[in-house]
Design a protein with these regions (language model features):
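Soluble "head" domains of membrane/secretory-pathway proteins
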Residues: 1-208
């Protein structure tokens, strides 16, 4: 049973969705907010064959657990989820414990590499982050690291090309030193962590 009243029902052009066209989603006012460890049902926000840009697939639903909220800073240490300033259990402890003890996970078909797939960060499924999860009206200084982490989100919000060139971030034709997010985002995880396509692999989930 899904309670759509928490964040508000969504309105979109179903005919455009059936024709595999981009859709604009309008969300009605909700009665509350999500909490860590809530189970979320959502549309997959990336193209299935490529995760480098956001495109809502309103005909495809995923079910995952909310690990981090807008404004949180998330890490994975030794295979266990951590949110700074939060001491309670996050996600499926048994699955995290299994992953933490597993020798050579790639030999079992587990994909070790993670979002944002950039060797300069060195992230993997057992050592990941810190990753600040953007919240609406939160600003970040734009540099190479924040470009790597947030380029999909910024390109989606602004509907413009973003690139890192000559040590600077360009949005369209404009130089960007700081960016203020227009949306809230979440980090979600499947309970079967050894076999789950979730935020560890494709990135952050837009609130829409």
């Amino acid at each position: 049973l899904v309670n759509k009243m928490i964040k508000g029902a969504r309105l979109f052009n179903v005919f455009a969705a059936l024709n595999n066209e981009d859709v604009t989603i309008h969300r009605m006012p909700g009665l509350g907010s999500f909490k860590r460890n809530d189970i979320l049902v959502f549309n997959f926000p990336y193209q299935e064959s490529r995760w480098d840009s956001i495109r809502m697939n309103v005909m495809q639903y995923y079910v995952k657990r909310c690990i981090a909220l807008p404004g949180d800073t998330l890490e994975i240490r030794g295979g266990f989820y951590k949110v700074r300033g939060y001491s309670e259990l996050l996600g499926n402890y048994e699955a995290q414990h299994y992953l933490s003890k597993l020798q050579h996970p790639e030999a079992r078909g587990i994909v070790v590499g993670t979002f944002p797939y950039d060797g300069s960060l060195g992230w993997n499924i057992r050592e990941f982050g810190p990753l600040p999860i953007p919240r609406k009206e939160q600003s970040v200084i734009m540099n190479h690291t924040t470009y790597i982490l947030y380029r999909q989100l910024i390109a989606w919000e602004q509907k413009k090309k973003i690139e890192f060139k000559d040590g600077q971030v360009l949005l369209g034709d404009s130089l960007v030193h700081q960016y203020c997010f227009k949306k809230n985002y979440y980090f979600v995880s499947g309970d079967n962590m050894a076999n789950s396509q979730d935020s560890r692999y494709w990135g952050m989930l837009p609130e829409e």
